[in-house]
């Protein structure tokens, strides 16, 4: 039994929106991670099969980090930061827009991109697992109890009767979202449904060994050197609070030539220390402090 409480009416409305429209745009959030890319690329792959006469475009606000550059179907991605004119044209022509793995348009980051998405006359659908989705979408599938948006997308695909369209590559995309958003199934936000989803994706021939190999054994040298610096110089422990904190400034990030992907898992490292239950990572970006 599915743990998500959508209605048959909502599923019927979603099916109709998809099949009645022909120019579809799908957005992940800015600086897309494994869940954002996995769910958007997998969803676009499904839509292309069930509605072959439609044009389906995934528009990422930013380039993809190196650690995800091997993902299947990545060549289908449109990158706003490298070709804004083309992406804005696709948005202006769209009659259906999907917002996946983000709860508000501002998470597209680029002002012109945000404005184009908000000004579009297209029907809009939000599918996400973050709290407090902004109003304005025609259909909202917001379930914070989900471990990842890829978990939601898999459930929606199956509920629509489209499981047969999940190829091995699409299953791999959905599994990468589950693995990365749960810290390889180590975070507390886990559920039996998550593992049933994982089991089904493996049955559908998701390439689990490839995912683990790419995430574990293909790190650039700068990633390892940054990690060593953080552990030696930047890790602060607060045993009385059972907590740890890591901070990195812009100068330090630039010194190592680090990208966002190089800092992705730093916050998890202190949790392997006996007596530490809480870990915080604070990064200075160009325009904000990221917690």
Predicted regions and their residues:
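Hydrophobic helix-and-loop "lid/oligomerization" segment in the mid-to-C-terminal part
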Residues: 2-28, 38-67, 71, 76-79, ...
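Short glycine-rich anion-binding loops that position phosphate/pyrophosphate groups of nucleotides
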Residues: 31-32, 102-105, 130-132, 250-251, ...
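Short glycine/serine/threonine-rich phosphate/pyrophosphate-binding segments
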Residues: 34-40, 105-110
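A short helix->loop->beta-strand "cap" motif at the edges of active sites that frequently abuts
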Residues: 51-54, 119-123
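Generic beta-sheet signal
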Residues: 59-61, 80-82, 100, 127-129, ...
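Short, conserved loop/helix-junction motifs that constitute active-site signature segments
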Residues: 90-92, 113-122
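N-terminal glycine-rich phosphate/adenylate-binding segment common to multiple enzyme folds
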Residues: 102-115, 134
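Short alpha-helices
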Residues: 127-197
């Amino acid at each position: 039994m599915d743990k998500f409480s959508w209605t048959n009416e909502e599923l019927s409305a979603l099916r109709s929106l998809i099949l009645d429209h022909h120019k579809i745009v799908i957005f992940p959030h800015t600086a897309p991670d494994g869940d954002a890319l996995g769910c958007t690329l997998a969803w676009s792959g499904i839509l292309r099969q069930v509605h072959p006469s439609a044009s389906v475009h995934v528009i990422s606000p930013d380039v993809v980090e190196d650690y995800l550059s091997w993902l299947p179907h990545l060549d289908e991605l449109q990158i706003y930061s490298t070709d804004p004119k083309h992406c804005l044209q696709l948005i202006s022509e769209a009659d259906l827009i999907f917002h996946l793995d983000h709860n508000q348009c501002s998470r597209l980051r680029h002002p012109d991109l945000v404005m184009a998405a908000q000004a579009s006359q297209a029907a809009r659908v939000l599918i996400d697992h973050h709290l407090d989705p902004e109003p304005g979408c025609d259909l909202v599938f917001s379930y914070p109890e989900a471990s990842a948006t890829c978990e939601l997308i898999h459930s929606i695909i199956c509920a629509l009767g489209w499981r047969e369209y999940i190829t091995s590559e699409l299953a791999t995309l959905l599994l990468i979202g589950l693995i990365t958003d749960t810290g390889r199934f180590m975070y507390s936000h886990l559920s039996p449904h998550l593992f049933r989803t994982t089991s089904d994706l493996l049955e559908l021939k998701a390439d689990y060994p490839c995912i683990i190999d790419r995430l574990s054994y293909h790190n650039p040298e700068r990633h390892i050197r940054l990690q060593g610096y953080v552990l030696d110089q930047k890790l602060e422990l607060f045993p009385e609070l059972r907590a740890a904190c890591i901070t990195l400034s812009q100068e330090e990030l630039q010194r190592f030539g680090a990208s966002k992907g190089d800092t992705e898992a730093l916050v998890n490292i202190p949790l392997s220390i006996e007596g530490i239950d809480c870990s915080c990572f604070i990064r200075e970006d160009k325009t904000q402090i990221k917690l």
